[in-house]
A protein has these predicted regions:
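Helix-adjacent hinge/juxtasegments
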Residues: 56-98
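C-terminal end-helix/capping segment
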Residues: 83, 90-96, 130-160
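Short, surface-exposed beta-strand-loop junctions and turns on beta-sheet-rich folds
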Residues: 41-42, 49, 56, 69-72, ...
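Flexible glycine-/small-residue-rich
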Residues: 37, 57-59, 66, 125-129
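Intrinsically disordered, Lys/Arg-rich N-terminal extensions and targeting peptides
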Residues: 1-31, 36, 144-160
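A structural signal for short hydrophobic beta-strand segments in well-ordered beta-sheet cores
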Residues: 53-57, 114
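Short, contiguous, helix-prone interaction/anchoring segments in small proteins
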Residues: 30-48
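Beta-rich strand-turn-strand
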Residues: 89-126, 130-132
Length: 160
C-alpha cells in the first residue's frame, strides 16, 4: 500500500484583493463562520464572493454582510439565502476591543480571506483604515518601480 499524502492544514477558498487596495490593514483576526445547510458544500465548490462584503457589530456579535455564497447545485429545498448575514465566532473580549476601535478611532472591519482550517471554515477579518487617493497612487508608483527593478535585474544576466 502506498503511503498517504498529508493534506495541507489550510486551504484558501477566497481572498478579498480589493480590501488590500482600498484599506490599510492594521491588524488581522481569525474568526469562525456560522454556516447553515448546504453552504459548506457550496464553499468547497468555490461559490463565494467577498468583494463587496463588510463586518458589522450588532448586539455584541460580529456579522459579515454582503458576502455572497452561491446556492448549492444539488441543494434544492435546503439552500439558504445567498446574501444573508452570517455570524462570525470570536471571543467577547476581542469583539469589545474591535467595537471600541471602530467606534472611537473610525476604523472599519473588512473580511480579508475565507479558508478551511482542519475542516472548519475560518475567516480572516482585518481592522482597517481607509486609504486616500494619494495613498493609492503612491502604492501604484511603488509597485511599478519594484517591477521595473526586477525586470532590469532579470534581464541583466542574459546573453544577447
Amino acid at each position: 500500500m502506498a503511503p498517504t499524502k498529508e493534506r495541507p492544514a489550510t486551504k484558501t477558498i477566497a481572498t478579498n484583493r480589493e480590501a488590500r487596495h482600498e484599506y490599510f490593514v492594521l491588524e488581522a483576526l481569525e474568526t469562525g463562520v456560522e454556516l447553515k445547510g448546504t453552504e459548506v458544500k457550496s464553499l468547497r465548490a468555490g461559490g463565494v464572493n467577498l468583494k463587496d462584503s463588510w463586518v458589522d457589530i450588532e448586539n455584541g456579535e460580529l456579522l459579515v454582510k454582503g458576502m455572497h455564497i452561491s446556492p448549492y447545485d444539488h441543494g434544492n429545498l435546503f439552500n439558504q439565502d445567498p446574501m444573508r448575514a452570517r455570524r462570525l465566532l470570536a471571543h467577547k473580549s476581542e469583539i469589545r476591543r474591535l467595537h471600541q476601535q471602530c467606534k472611537l478611532q473610525g476604523y472599519t472591519l473588512v473580511p480579508l480571506s475565507l479558508y478551511f482550517k482542519h475542516g472548519r471554515v475560518k475567516m480572516e477579518v482585518g481592522l482597517c483604515k481607509g486609504k486616500k487617493l494619494y495613498d493609492k497612487r503612491a502604492d501604484a508608483a511603488q509597485r511599478d518601480a519594484k517591477r521595473s527593478i526586477d525586470r532590469a535585474v532579470k534581464s541583466n544576466g542574459k546573453y544577447y
